[in-house]
Regions:
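Short glycine/acidic-rich loop motifs that flank beta-strands on beta-rich extracellular proteins
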Residues: 480-481, 522-525, 531-532, 566-574, ...
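C-terminal, active-site-flanking charged/polar segments
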Residues: 116, 381-388, 393-416, 720-763
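Compositionally biased, low-complexity/repeat regions
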Residues: 1-437
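N-terminal extracellular ligand-recognition/capping segment immediately after the signal peptide
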Residues: 88, 448-509, 513-527, 562
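Extracellular/surface-exposed low-complexity segments
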Residues: 739, 744-839
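Right-handed parallel beta-helix/beta-spiral solenoid domain characteristic of secreted/periplasmic
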Residues: 493-574, 594, 599, 610-613
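Right-handed parallel beta-helix
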Residues: 555-565, 583-595, 635-650, 656-669, ...
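Acidic/polar low-complexity surface segments
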Residues: 427, 513, 521-539, 587-635, ...
């Protein structure tokens, strides 16, 4: 409990009273009495401070924001507290700039925190110059033309230049400079209509996440004459189960650019950070928005190329264990080359192209074999669509240095912070707060100690205090519970060569540091159990009660980790195979389901999707070989999955499961075969029942079969079956409405009571709700994001009048409504706003 004694009244008393108080037969009675007064006085003191802070929009409590808005005459909105606060804070400044493009863009950013760009579409209409009044700034003939108007310059209202791929790549984007004929059709959601009154407001909904300093996957060497080609996949996931010869089976990553305005605003401090109206920084410039990198604009030397806006190259001291001298730039992709082998080189930078090193964007589906012109020495080729980088060097020594020492900082896109992402994280709280800075806080850096994770787990079987293991980088860390250094900390349950479980004497937290996304590569499944379950001797009731209390408090928490399978991971095994603890928490993690589409030939014959693998297989009984331990273990382990992405969860009824703002993927999207189970029992998924389950904002790709279920805001893409339909209630959910396969008849769903839910195949047909996702493939930018074609009831009639599913907490429906309300107030007469999502 927080101590509220802000003013020490007892210490302010004259010393004579304190002396007499200490000399009483029962000493310090006055001090005890004043302690109660001090506590109440502290509450009053704190409340007075809060009342002062509530006078200012930058520091007031959330509930005060609409009252300050009333003083300004601002209409009330609902949604994310940050956006509402920014909307009120900038009210006066935006009113002064009402009707300008800058005000509209800033208003859109305040209400959504998305990238925004406004275009007056009348400027893109076809237009002919008056022969007697030619515009020099728009390409008038000499002597009316300006020197800045080059051969490749796009003329307003003119024809398309076909000789510059970098400029052509802008066609159909928010920065399209080409001319179009007038489009008189009525506006449609997300459609661009080029006409005089239309103002297009382009919005980048996907967030850009930057992984700072990771190791790319070296593929192999190639040769182009005397030039050595060094091939890398940017995605650090090695996929060791894929043989080296089958390179097309590895996982691509779509490279994104960073949002410069977000990065700029993140560097501002204090209350000034909220006041965006005073920022002179442009909100959305070409090549500086959080969208996919355009391949054609990466080519150096092209008239419209801008590789310096997407890519930077620097050298670093490879002998440094902490990489403190590493300079992270603001671009989407940064290559860090070893200083010893590449010292003194001149790299391409803005307005200063390198004399020797060149940059090119190209399709690297066949690596250097498909390049025209061929790969040259001191050339870097980037394929942002597949996430590949190719270097051309003239010596094998340099090629070896790149293979062993190259580091990359790259950016990718995702709908929001569900799964493992490099996001800011607060210090450990609750059960682990006391250990965040004490002797049980263990920091892991791969370059300082490659076996640091194993060392951090030393003595967890003896330490009764909570242990915090924080991984402070974004490299790949191997964890093997069968490692020789963990012999004392693990148990094989008396079976020689059997699976080993990590023994715990107190709570354990393994987390990513703030703004990091480490990869945890397992050599065998994770298994957890108490270090001691039965008292010694078993008849010692006091000791047994103490052990029972310790086991009930035994919590394992994984936070911010991307958990994958390693080289020797047993085939068919789940990532987590045992949780004989009080509570297992998976927070902001990705328990890699795989299921991705690997590198492969271009459409129309894309490669097949990789199989999906189980995330958990937790059985009852709980894996104790000694009957006495199994009998004494009284806990019903709680499994909590919060804002995470997992593969199938096969868990028996002896556990409880809580899913919040998460995605559970069995590889079965809308319209796919419904045979795979996403949540079910650990034995036979088709006949066993899963645990009692609570859901809140979850998207489930696959069938669900549980003992009972309650909650709200879930999307069940396939059938949901609850054994006990008399227990629990589901609200604001989507059910598939699937039918049982013949010869059986009737609905496949077995549902408890439900309220305000919709079905994909409802009767009558007009009541059915269409469900569509931007992508159903893990790792793709729009994974599990609801598409615009989804029924509005799914997008806007979930909990709190927002969307159902894993991303409902983002309040996107509120953002769209708030934009429409504010634009009606800010739009000039005769101007029609078109809201167009780019991602």
């Amino acid at each position: 409990m927080r101590d509220e004694r802000r003013v020490p009244l007892y210490a302010r008393l004259p010393e004579i009273y304190r002396t007499k108080d200490a000399e009483l037969p029962a000493p310090f009675q006055l001090r005890a009495y004043l302690a109660l007064v001090e506590q109440a006085f502290g509450h009053i003191h704190r409340n007075v401070e809060e009342l002062y802070h509530d006078l200012f929009i930058e520091t007031c409590a959330d509930w005060v924001v609409p009252y300050i808005g009333d003083l300004l005459g601002t209409s009330h909105l609902s949604g994310d507290p940050w956006t509402l606060r920014a909307d009120v804070a900038d009210t006066i400044a935006l009113r002064r700039r009402k009707g300008t493009l800058g005000a509209i863009e800033l208003l859109a950013y305040n209400l959504t925190r998305w990238g925004a760009h406004c275009v007056e579409l009348r400027e893109n209409l076809v237009w002919n110059q008056h022969l007697n009044h030619q515009r020099p700034d728009e390409g008038g003939l000499p002597p009316y033309g300006l020197p800045t108007v080059k051969r490749q310059t796009v003329m307003r209202g003119g024809t398309v230049t076909l000789r510059d791929p970098a400029m052509l790549a802008l066609r159909g984007t928010p920065f399209d400079p080409f001319a179009y004929t007038a489009d008189v059709k009525p506006p449609t959601p997300g459609g661009v209509r080029y006409n005089l009154p239309n103002l297009a407001i382009f919005l980048w909904r996907l967030a850009a996440y930057r992984v700072a300093v990771s190791r790319p996957v070296f593929v192999d060497f190639g040769a182009v004459g005397p030039v050595v080609a060094v091939r890398f996949n940017v995605n650090p996931l090695t996929r060791p189960d894929v043989p080296p010869a089958a390179q097309r089976e590895r996982q691509p990553v779509r490279l994104f650019n960073t949002h410069r305005f977000d990065l700029f605003n993140a560097k501002r401090e204090g209350t000034d950070k909220l006041d965006l109206s005073r920022v002179t920084f442009d909100l959305s410039l070409i090549d500086e928005v959080p969208g996919p990198v355009l391949l054609e604009r990466l080519t150096e030397g092209a008239p419209a190329g801008a590789p310096e806006k997407y890519l930077s190259v620097e050298t670093y001291d490879e002998a440094s264990a902490t990489l403190q001298r590493l300079d992270i730039s603001d671009v989407g992709l940064q290559l860090h080359l070893p200083e010893t082998s590449f010292a003194g080189e001149e790299w391409p930078v803005a307005q200063l192209p390198a004399l020797a090193w060149k940059v090119r964007g190209a399709n690297l589906c066949a690596w250097e074999a498909g390049l025209r012109p061929p790969l040259a020495n001191k050339e870097i080729v980037v394929d942002p669509v597949r996430g590949r980088v190719l270097f051309g060097v003239n010596t094998q020594a340099r090629a070896d240095a790149l293979r062993d020492q190259l580091l990359v900082t790259y950016t990718y896109g995702a709908p929001g912070p569900v799964g493992s992402h490099p996001v800011p994280r607060p210090a450990p709280s609750g059960l682990f707060a006391a250990s965040a800075s004490g002797p049980n806080f263990r920091r892991v850096l791969l370059r300082q100690n490659p076996a640091g994770l194993h060392d951090a787990l030393q003595n967890v079987h003896l330490n009764p205090a909570p242990v915090v293991v924080e991984i402070a980088d974004s490299f790949t860390h191997a964890l093997d519970l069968g490692h020789p250094s963990l012999v004392e900390e693990t148990s094989d349950e008396g079976v020689v060569g059997g699976p080993r479980s990590l023994m715990l004497n107190g709570p354990l937290l393994i987390r990513a540091a703030s703004n990091q996304r480490p990869i945890l590569k397992l050599q065998r499944p994770l298994r957890f159990r108490p270090a001691k379950v039965v008292a010694t001797p078993p008849t010692d009731a006091a000791q047994q009660a103490e052990l029972d209390g310790r086991v009930s408090n035994l919590t394992v928490r994984l936070e911010g980790l991307h958990v994958v399978r390693g080289e020797n991971f047993p085939a068919g095994e789940p990532l987590i195979a045992r949780a004989a603890v009080g509570r297992l928490e998976i927070i902001n993690c990705t328990l890699d389901p795989e299921g991705f589409i690997p590198f492969g030939p271009s459409p129309p014959s894309p490669p097949a999707r990789r199989p999906v693998r189980r995330a958990m297989n937790l059985r009852e009984p709980y894996g104790f070989s000694a009957p006495a331990e199994e009998e004494v273990f009284k806990e019903t382990p709680e499994v909590v999955v919060h804002r995470s992405i997992t593969g199938p969860l096969h868990i028996d009824r002896g556990y409880t499961l809580a899913l919040t703002d998460s995605v559970v993927d069995a590889g079965q999207g809308v319209g796919n075969d419904a045979a795979a189970f996403a949540v079910s029992g650990a034995g036979n998924p088709s006949s066993d029942w899963g645990p009692p389950t609570t859901v809140s904002g979850v998207t489930v790709f696959g069938r669900t079969r549980v003992e009972s279920i309650t909650g709200r805001g879930a999307i069940f893409v396939h059938a949901l079956e609850a054994r006990d339909v008399q227990k629990g209630c589901l609200k604001y959910c989507y059910f598939s409405g699937e039918r049982k396969p013949l010869p059986a008849t009737g609905p496949a769903d077995r549902l408890p009571q439900n309220h305000a839910c919709v079905r994909g195949s409802a009767q009558p047909a007009e009541e059915s709700a269409v469900l569509r996702f931007t992508s159903e493939i893990p790792g793709e930018p729009g994974y599990a994001q609801l598409a615009a074609a989804t029924d509005f009831r799914v997008r806007e009639r979930g909990p709190a009048d927002d969307q159902m599913g894993a991303y409902g907490f983002l309040l996107e429906a509120h953002k769209w409504r708030n934009l429409q309300i504010r634009f009606r107030e800010f739009m000039p007469v005769g101007v029609r706003a078109l809201l167009i999502p780019v991602t």
